[in-house]
Amino acid sequence: MVLIHFKSRDLTRLHRRGRFWHTFFLLDPTISGDSVGGAIIAQDEVDTWTVHDFRAPGSKQSISSAEETIYRVLGAMGGPYPITIDEIIQQSTWTPSIALAKSYTGPLHRVFLAGDACHQTIPSGGYGMNMGIADAFNLGWKLAAMIQGWGGARLLLSYEQERRPVAELMQHWGKVHAGKLVGLASAVTLNATIIDASDARGAELRQKIHEYVQSNDAHNQCFGVEHGYQYHSDITVKSASSHPPFDPRSYTPTTHPGFRAPHVFLNDGSAIFDKFGKTLTLVEFMDGVPGPSSGGSFFRDTADEHHIPLRIVSLVGEANAQQIWGARLVLVRPDHCVSWCGNDVGSKDDAKRVLLQAAGHVCW
């Protein structure tokens, strides 16, 4: 791909079809040579833009100037579409690639990889930076637990167990999204001479394009891929209960172990996340007066005995939050992922098994 960053305040021309963030263009190879598509991205809603010129595999290096390339991409299936360009900031080429490290850690578990160092994906869906941030969030609290002395030997092992499968998931859906974007050209017979026509043929072609885009917009609406994945690792306490099935398009809140704890506003307008601590947090929903329940007391005593920092958040009268969370007791990690959930624990030994596994000391 050819990538061009530039500045332009020619909004009359650039916003001819309205304001946008990303706009994709289909190019006719009989008109545009090796170009098979293009896109423009609004970087700051003011004057900074990026144009991508999608080149066919094995194509020759373009000899067009940066300005000519911009005009050709913006013109799409028609002729060049000139705009006033104030500055060409940078022009470069890049090749989309998908790569995944075999391991996220060294053999002695003293070196860890995160972000682009261990995975690459294509931009479709916007998963790349989110993957890196989640890597850091996942690894950061585990490193802190080891340094602070309360993390067990299995804690750092769980980093790769949890994050590498998520990278595979994101890479898969990034490829799916990219295929849908470029698939329009084969799904709909495009004709540059009638796409803007005011007659029935033009209306029919535009309707077909509209229907394809609306039914293949998962790169913008894939909430299940972003929020609905589950961690499987040694520090996640297995549950006999069922969890919502994975749906790439939609996210169903759940506190089943391994999933991200659901966001919800409490009665006072605060977010439940604001109640969490920097280490493990036990959220318990209470019917009576505030204060740890018997289950909460078991967890508190176990945490004290094993020097595991634990915040207990007792919520009274939070029927809406409890309905969404679906359990009376939920153990949440510092990265807001659920370690365990249940309606009660029968003894301190039960709480001990849960807490020691969540901290990486044992795996039952």
Predicted regions and their residues:
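Helical substrate-recognition/capping region of FAD-dependent monooxygenase/halogenase enzymes
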Residues: G75, A145-W364
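Core Rossmann-like FAD-binding/catalytic domain of the broad FAD-dependent monooxygenase superfamily
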Residues: M1-L205, S297
